[in-house]
Every structure is written in C-alpha cells, then in structure tokens.
C-alpha cells in the first residue's frame, strides 16, 4: 500500500518527515496511508457517478492532500473541500426534500455519493484524519459535478421560489404546498412573459425609430 510522507520543503513525496528534521510543524499529520483496495473501491464509485472520468492514481490523491496541508500551514481553509462539501449538503437536501422529485438521470449518482460519504469505514481517507479527512469526499463530489450541476442549480432555484411563495402567503417555507412540476410551470410562464415583453419592446423601438422625423435641409 502506498504511504506518503509529506515534506513541504521538497516537491517529492517519498521523504521521511519529522518536525525536528524539517523544521516545519505540520498540522497534526505527517503521513497519509492510501490502501490499494480502498483506492480501487473509490475509483469504482467514481466510475459510477462520472463514467467519463479517468481513474485517480494514489499520487494524485497525495498531491491534492499536500496542497491542502500547505494551505492549512498558512492558516488557510481549503476552499476546494469547503465548496464541494457544501455541494454534498445540497445533494442530501434535494434527496430528502419531499416536495422535490430528483430527476431520474441524476438520482443514482446522487445516492451513490451520499452512500460513500456515509460509509466512513470503507472510505479512502478516514474522516478523522486531521485537515484532509474529507478530501476524498470532496474529490468524489467534484468528479460528479458536471453531471449534477444542472439538477442542483434547479433545486436551488426551487428553494428560492418556495421562500418567495412563503413570504407572499405569510407562512413558513416548509408549509408551502408546491412541487417540482409547479415550480417548473411557473418558471416557464415567467420565461414566456419575459420573451413577450422583449418582443414588444423591440417592436416599439423599431416603430419609433422608423417614424422619427428626420433633418430637413433648406
């Protein structure tokens, strides 16, 4: 199984690191163990949620972990992990929302991601590893985002619509009796109205431009 020792003064990975030797105090982690069987399972999940994505190599995961740790040493939070885990929260919310029917083409991948996140015992990186414990989760979400972005953006718009309806009716958002098809119908109506208004404005502009008096030279 690959064992990666992190020396942040050097670009190579297979170096022994201790605080005394390097003069660097790493954020509570000096090595990362990537078991071959767990990497194989991780790549199987990646293949199911993102069929076009090539399999990850251990060196790629180690390189990503090194970058996260370097940022942590500077007191910086990993934006990569933070943003992808927020997306993971959106996936959970969409799947758990009784008023939102997840599209059939994206539901399997979304459930696959949630299942991986919840099975910490078989995760590529243990969740309790300092700083990088959620890195594999974030990488999995990132790999699937090309196929899920549209669905999650639609769900976010549905939530905004539901909040607006709640404000209009004077009730709580979870009391709004609306579903995906209602939201879609309303948005289609809004789109048709917007297109109609654009055509009217364009017609009026063309009419006023053609009837405007020109200059007369005497």
Write out the residue ranges for each language-model feature.
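Membrane-inserting effector segments that mediate pore formation, membrane fusion
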Residues: 108, 112-141
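Terminal, membrane-proximal amphipathic helices
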Residues: 1-109, 146-218
């Amino acid at each position: 199984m690959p064992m990666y020792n992190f020396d942040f003064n050097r670009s190579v990975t297979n170096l022994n690191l201790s605080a005394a030797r390097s003069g660097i105090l790493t954020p509570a982690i000096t090595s990362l163990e990537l078991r071959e069987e767990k990497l194989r399972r991780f790549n199987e999940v990646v293949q199911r949620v993102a069929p076009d994505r090539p399999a990850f190599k251990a060196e790629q995961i180690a390189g990503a972990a090194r970058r996260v740790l370097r940022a942590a040493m500077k007191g910086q939070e990993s934006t990569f992990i933070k943003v992808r885990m927020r997306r993971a929260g959106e996936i959970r919310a969409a799947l758990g929302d009784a008023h939102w029917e997840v599209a059939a083409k994206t539901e399997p991948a979304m459930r696959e991601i949630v299942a991986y996140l919840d099975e910490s015992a078989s995760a590529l990186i243990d969740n309790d590893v300092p700083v990088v414990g959620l890195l594999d989760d974030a990488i999995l979400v990132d790999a699937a985002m090309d196929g899920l972005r549209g669905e999650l953006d639609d769900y976010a718009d549905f939530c905004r619509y539901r909040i607006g309806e709640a404000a209009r009716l004077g009730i709580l958002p979870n009391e709004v009796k609306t579903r995906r098809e209602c939201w879609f119908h309303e948005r289609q109506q809004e789109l048709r109205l917007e297109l109609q208004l654009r055509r009217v404005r364009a017609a009026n502009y063309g009419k006023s431009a053609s009837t405007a008096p020109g200059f007369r030279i005497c």
